[in-house]
Structure formats: C-alpha cells, structure tokens
A protein has these predicted regions:
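N-terminal leader/pro-regions and domain N-caps
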Residues: 1-39
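Long, low-complexity, largely intrinsically disordered segments
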Residues: 35-43, 109-111
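Short, solvent-exposed beta-strand/turn "edge" segments of beta-rich domains on protein surfaces
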Residues: 42-53, 63-70
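Buried hydrophobic-core signal for structured, non-transmembrane domains
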Residues: 58-62
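Acidic (Asp/Glu-rich), glycine- and aromatic
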Residues: 65-90, 175
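Short helix-loop boundary/capping segments
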Residues: 78, 92-166, 174-177
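Solvent-exposed serine/threonine-rich low-complexity stretches and specific carbohydrate-binding patches
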Residues: 89-95, 183-184
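Acidic, serine/threonine- and proline-rich intrinsically disordered appendage/tail regions
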Residues: 106-130, 165-237
C-alpha cells in the first residue's frame, strides 16, 4: 500500500491538526519552492502529520500467497472514527492540470462505504463520479505470487475521518477479512488513513478561511511557486 497523490485534483493542498511551525531553514526553503519539488514537499508534509484534503489517492498491491489461490470478493472502508474537519493549519495550493485515472472509490460519508466503481466518463466532483458496488459483479482471483494493483480514491465532503481498508478474500473454502492500513517508512506497525474535508466556506469571499488558525497560500507569481503565509481572516482566493 502506498499513497499516490493526484496533483490534478489535490494540487498541493494539505491540512494539519495544529501549527506548521516550527520550521527549520531547510523547511522554509522547501515551502518557498514547493511546486518545484512536489514529491519531496508531499513526503515532508505527510511526515509532519499532514492530512489529505477532501480526497485521498492510493495504490493497493495485493499478492497471492496460497498455492491453491485466493479470490478477492469484497472491499470496503472500515471507519475508525470521524469528526469535524481539521482547522489547524491549511496549506492552500489549488490544482492545475488534468486528473489521473482511478479504478475504485470509497465515499466515507456513506453509512456503509463499500468499494464503488469510478465512472470513467465522470470527473472528480461530478454527480455519479462513484457508481455501483464494484465487487457486487467483480471477483479478483489471485494465483500464488500473482500481484493485483488497485487504484483507490476516498472522499469526504463534510468530515475528518480516520479509517482502514477491509479486504474480503475467499480462501480454503471460506471467507477471511483482512484489515489494511499504511506503514510509514521505518515503522513496523500500520497506521490508519486520514482525510479531512475543507472547513472553510468555499465561497471565495474575504474571510472565508477565518476558521483556520494558520493559512499558507501557494504564490504562483514566482517560478517555482511556493507557499507564503496569509491572514485567514482577510484572505480571498
């Protein structure tokens, strides 16, 4: 399992539980040149506890480990807990460019967030972007040593959610459920995924970001673009 940011949808936007401070000299330089070091910046943000905003993208690689084979018959989001959107620091870097392709998705606001087919003729944010229950009509068999890669999107419109993936597999004549999180580099245990909806009003008016304690905005007047501090009480996109 690994994260796969889609900058065409997510841009460089991140949220934090608290402050982005303190910042070292190197941290400040990375913020100042974030658009020129996108991968490094995103890894740095995740390492500081940064949380995806509105949507998370990831790739799940499942490998067959039984001689007789297994079959993936179900996948759903296992919610640990949800609450109000994060209002610590927001790094606001809206997207520019095309979005990538995704296979299945979870709507974390659903009462039962099963894996749903992403409609290829829809864009993120469109009505019916997520369609039918993917595994209602699909079963994925895995032979010993065979890999299957799932491109996954998870969304929320109104909450902060902490969650895992529950994978249902048919093996040795019965069903088993496997709970999957992600493993931070250098960490032996797995952690839950996190995603938060934006807490601001999204109306483009002055003061619409005032709910945040800190705000950093991507300044595209420079090349490469970087983040500069802004007053959340007065900033307007």
């Amino acid at each position: 399992m690994f994260f796969d940011r889609d900058n065409g949808i997510q841009g460089l936007t991140w949220a934090l539980h608290g402050s982005v401070q303190p910042l070292s000299v190197n941290d400040r330089l990375l913020l100042k040149r974030a658009a020129g070091s996108v991968t490094e910046f995103n890894e740095w943000m995740r390492g500081r506890g940064g949380v995806d905003v509105d949507v998370s993208f990831m790739k799940l690689i499942v490998t067959g480990q039984r001689q007789a084979g297994v079959a993936i018959i179900d996948m759903r989001a296992k919610i640990d807990h949800c609450g109000a959107p994060l209002i610590g620091a927001l790094l606001y870097g809206p997207p520019e460019g095309e979005q990538g392709n995704t296979q299945i998705g979870f709507d974390l606001d659903d009462s039962v967030p099963v894996a749903r087919q992403v409609n290829s003729d829809k864009s993120f944010g469109d009505r019916d972007y997520l369609g039918r229950d993917y595994f209602k009509t699909n079963t994925t068999p895995l032979a010993l040593g065979q890999d299957e890669v799932f491109s996954i999107v998870a969304t929320t419109r109104s909450r902060y959610c902490v969650w895992y993936i529950d994978l249902g597999v048919f093996v040795d004549g019965h069903r088993q459920d496997i709970t999957i999180g992600y493993k931070p580099e250098g960490n032996q245990g797995q952690k839950p995924f996190e995603v938060t909806a934006r807490a601001d009003l999204r109306n483009g008016e002055k003061g619409s970001f005032s709910i945040y304690r800190e705000l950093y905005v991507l300044d595209r007047r420079h090349d490469p673009a970087g983040f500069v501090p802004a007053d959340p009480r007065t900033y307007a996109p």
